[in-house]
Amino acid sequence: MISDKNFAIRLTDVDVCFYVRETGAVSLKEVLFSLGKRPFLDKKFVLRNINLEIKHGESIALLGKNGSGKSTLLRVLSGIIEPEKGKIEVNGVVAPLLSLGVGLEYEMTGQENIKLLCALMGMSQAEIKNYTQEIIEFSELGEAINWQVKRYSTGMMTRLAFSIAIIKQPDILLIDEVLSVGDVGFQKKCLKKVEEIKAKGATIVFVSHNFNEVKSMCSKGVLVNNGTIDFIGDIEEVGERYSKLF
């Protein structure tokens, strides 16, 4: 539930880093002294000094080249990735629609996944029962809803994940590229549903390489480049700056 704070998401001085194995030669002495200890690791910053505030009801596009950090930023907003430092404040119920299949249990059927994920979203058994048929109908999976998810194509996983994520009006909807998978008809259906969610006052954060799609959905953009925020502003201006990166 939304409180009286005037923002949906606020990030203050956020850094995110990953630890990777060092490259290059390692001396025999270093190897011997490291036995039984943590392997040699390099600290690689993926995001640095991120400051961003998104207000309730805003529709924001995250734009940037591959590897810029925009998808990592979306995962930070969803709570999947913890920052190395900094503060993250989220004011509302978040529905993340990120990488294909994330959150789905592959050994379970589609219908079993509906029950599981709806329960994890905080729904009561009565709500789950009421929403299940609506989810199945929106997904257009038909009899495949009784298959194990490991038999699904990527498009079928997208249908199921999206249908579950949007069944209840979220306060904040996070979308990362996944709507580009599957047939055009279902993509249009999903975008129409996102527009309906937006019209009811939800905050939308959208990552896509399709600028026309982004422009129709979002009025504001954030340009992410080399792990930092280069620019925040009107979507047209952000789009122009984005195009100059290539």
Question: What is the role of each PLM region?
Answer:
Residues 63-65:
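The feature captures the beta-strand-to-loop junction immediately N-terminal to the Walker
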Residues 1-46, 236-245:
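Pre-NBD coupling/linker segments of ABC/ABC-like ATPases
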Residues 226-227, 242:
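Conserved ABC ATPase "signature" C-loop
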Residues 214-216:
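A short, surface-exposed alpha-helical micro-motif characterized by mixed small hydrophobic
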Residues 29-34, 115, 127-144:
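Conserved ABC ATPase "signature" region
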Residues 208-209:
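H-loop/switch region of ABC-family ATPase nucleotide-binding domains
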